[in-house]
Each structure stands twice: as structure tokens, then as C-alpha cells.
Amino acid sequence: MARVVPGFTFLFFGFLGLISNIPAEAAIKNYQFDIQVKNVSRLCHAKPIVTVNGRFPGPTIYVREGDRVRINVTNHAQYNMSIHWHGLKQYRNGWADGPAYITQCPIQTGNSYTYDFNVTGQRGTLWWHAHILWLRATVHGAFVIMPKPGTPFPFPQPHQEFELLLGEWWHADVEEVVKQGTNTGLPPNMSDAHTINGKPGPLFPCSEKHTFAIEVESGKTYLLRIINAALNDELFFAIAGHNMTVVEVDAVYTKPFSTQAILIAPGQTTNVLVQANQVPGRYFMAARPYMDAPLSIDNKTAAGILQYKGIPNTFLPTLPQLPAPNDTEFALSYNKKLRSLNTPRYPANVPLKVDRNLFYTVGFGKNSCPTCLNGTKLLASLNNISFVMPQVALLQAHYFNVKGVYRVDFPDRPPIPFNYTGAPLTANLGTAIGTRISKIAFNSTVELVLQDTNLLTVESHPFHLHGYNFFVVGTGIGNFDPVKDPAKYNLVDPVERNTVGVPTGGWTAIRFRADNPGVWFLHCHLELHTSWGLKTAFVVEDGPGADQSVLPPPKDLLPC
């Protein structure tokens, strides 16, 4: 999880075995991922979990901008598997994107599939994770893209780097927890702990040896690559006694700013610089949920340790002052500070003219379910449509013109306007269901406004768009006003990312240019909401040029 810069070292699991560093030139990077079940002990209890190469979290992928990456995944577990390379744009190459039944059929037990893609025009911290069922609870890892040789960071060079993956842990088998929730029609049980690099930390029982620690030297600067791999929780993260300087989110450089804590939603990444400038000692790094919706409070705090060199382990650490779990003011203020670097080398190419305006409401609902506990089951929807997963991958159906798999009639707006963020609505909560997606013209510019609603309850939702980055041009609390709110947009240096939070009882506006043909998933990155149907997809048409259409599928394309 750590590297020294320059001359960094790392673990590289490839076809060629253990390699010690990244070659300076662009290269082909080969990895072998074996999906294996392994017994792991946490919180005084052992259980079998699904892993990559027997590791939890899984191995970090290290590449340089411009490299070609080939990752062969062999499934030895009892579950079907697919791996998503979260934030990789996969230009024209949705075959390597990974979400099951969207761009590929899953890898069945005993089978293999090779993800073969180029890392073009991207550098920074991304990650990979399972994209089927809830298996990403334990099947995930970092994906670090170093700049091209000779290209420095646009911030002070750190002495050393560490990846921190924030996650969740359940005592029970996660898939059994989900199955129980599905059978009752109610939310499944919350996780029993949060983790830092798979370890809950000493605030949990039987966790003294399950505590992640990093060692620092006084006067030196460190880069933390922080990834929220949790399934269902936005998280605050802070280090006792130390400020952090945010320099990148979702593998895009930002204008640096100092903060005592960060807010990071599932799917997002944040790079921060930390100066070891405090009295030498041991300091807790801590993460706990941000939950401002009127729901059950999850107040479990994961802790790791930042330890100065030479300080004994008997030295008692101090805890950081994290924002309160419902500190919406901090959350809104923090997100407003995120701005693109917008320099000649790293411009913010914000679409100023919009060809297609989309307005999607985000909400919950209830449909009839005679076998469920209360005769109903909870659902989630966009524009009152709960997405139904197909039995054939959407990209295959699109490419091979297979009829009857999906409909391209997803509405640009909700069927009935209402007071989206007024008093909670508890009647007429039925939702339509279907595999309905939206067709987007190649190279058109799109503005999408995501509006939270009061259907059952308001709640924050982190949305991830596959195949693209987008600019977050506006956000606000209450109902989006299409006349007044666009005048307040930031069209100069808005933050660019691949996953954005829709605030509780509010809205977020994003813009992107649809220049990547294929079928691209759009979904809430809270796994619970995704499983309830809070998802859809864009099918972006081919362009007129020879290099503007979906690439042919790989020879090992999997059947469903």
C-alpha cells in the first residue's frame, strides 16, 4: 500500500510474476486475477470471502499514462464475476468496462476473460471492483496511473505515497444478507464495521492486529490516495492534528486547498498531501459515515494510525475531530471548494453550448410483492422507472442488433412534475419497471440535472457514469429552477469527475460531450439503491469517422 517517490516500489501481480518497478516507456502491463474464496478473520469472527489472488483488499494496479493493460480474470469462486475499472474511460472499448449484463456477460465459475484496454489521457487514482451482486464488498483494489515519464505532478513532489481504501465489513455472508433483504422487501442489515485497507482498527473488538498503519518522518510530505470502496456510506476522513491539501479527485487535478477533513462518496477517489509537521507521536486516521437523511444512523468509526518514525507502539494515539454525522454545512462547503486546475496543460473543456437537456428525478417507491414481509417491496427509480437488468448484455445487444433486450425510450423528464423536495410523499409510490435506456447522438453535448425527491424520504445519492468524466457545473438545495439556477453555473473551472453526490433534498447539474460510442451505465453507487433499480444507461451512437465507432468485440467474448 506504500511507495517511495522517486524509486518507488510496489507489488505487481502479472503473468510474469513479481516485478519491482514500472518501466519508463509506455508498455503492455499484464496481470493475472484469480477469483478465490479465502477464510478471513475480523471482529473476533472468521468467514469465507471472495478475493482476488487471496488478498483483501486486492492487488493495486500500477501503470503509466499511455500504457496498454491486459488483465486476465479466472473465476474459481461459486459466484459469477465481472470486474469494472472504475473511472477508466475505455474509449470505443466498452467490452473492457466490466458491469455484468451491461457491457459483458459475467465470467462463470471455471471460466476466464481478459480485459484489454489502453490508458489514454488519464493519470491519477482510480480503482477496480466487482460489478455483479454485492461482491465488491471484498473484491476491490486501487488503480494508480502515474504521469508520462518526465511529467511532474502539478504540486510538490511527495516523499512517499500510500493507498487508503475505505470499506465496510459484515459479520455474515454479504450475499446472504442481501438475499434476506430481497426476500423481505426491506433494506438488508447495515455493515458491522468500516475498514481502512480491510482493517477496522482498534476501536472495534479483536482488532488490535487488524489496524492499518503508516510510518512518516518529520518534515516530509506524503501523498495519500484515498478511495471510498464502501458499499453504502459516504464517509468523512481526517487525521488527528494534521491538515490535508486536496490536489486531485477522480484522477483529475484540482486547485489545491487545505482542509481538516474530506468528504468522499462510494466510488470517488481523493488525493491529499499531508505534511509530517506535528510533534512526533501516533495519530489516528479515522473514517465514519456522513448521514444527513432521516434514516438510521450508522456511527461506526474505522481507524488507522499515522506514526512518526522512532515513536514506540506503546504511545497512545489521539483521535481526530471528525465532522458530525449530519454536518450538511461542512459537506456543502467542502464540495464547493473543489475546482478544476484549468491550466494550459490541464484545461477544463466545459461544454458551453448544450445540445440535449436531461432532467432525472431520483426517488424511492413501493411495488406489490405478495411474498414480502409487508406485501410490498422497496424500489428506487429515475424518472419513476426502476431499471430491470437484462439477460443479455446491453452492449452485445446493441452491437449485434439483438432485438427485444432493451427499449430506447427512457424519458428525458419525469412523467409528472411535482414539489420534488417538499413534505415526504407516502402515497401512490408505485414505480414503472423496465430495461429502458436513452439514445445519445455522437459528439453531442449533454446536460443532466439529477434531482433528489421526497418520495418516502430525501437522501444523498452518489451517481457514477461509466465511459466518461463530466463537469459538475451546479448544485443546490431544494427544487432545481431551470430559469434561475443555470445563471449561477460555474462554467470556468468546475470540478471534473466520474462520480458525483446529489445532495439530500437538492440537485446536481453535470455536463459532458458524448464522444465515446457504446453503451454506458449510469447508476447510484450506493449498492443498496442500485439493487433496487436506481440505474439506467446511455447508448451513444457511432460517429461518422472510422475511429468513432465501437471496436469489434474480443475473441474471448463471453456468452450469457
Question: Which sequence ranges carry the predicted segments?
Answer:
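Cleavable N-terminal signal peptides of Sec/SRP-targeted secreted and luminal proteins
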Residues: 3-23
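Acidic-aromatic/histidine active-site loop/patch
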Residues: 158-231, 319, 334-338, 356, ...
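Low-complexity, Pro/Ser/Thr- and charge-rich linker/hinge segments at domain boundaries
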Residues: 148-162, 310-325, 544-553
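Boundary at the C-terminal end of the N-terminal hydrophobic targeting segment
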Residues: 24-28
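Histidine- and aromatic-enriched segments that form or immediately flank copper-ligand environments
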Residues: 29-155, 233-262, 282-298, 369-513, ...
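Intrinsic disorder/low-complexity detector
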Residues: 317-358, 391-392, 397-405, 409, ...
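Conserved small-residue hotspots that stabilize compact domain segments
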Residues: 240-250, 254-257, 261-313, 318-321, ...
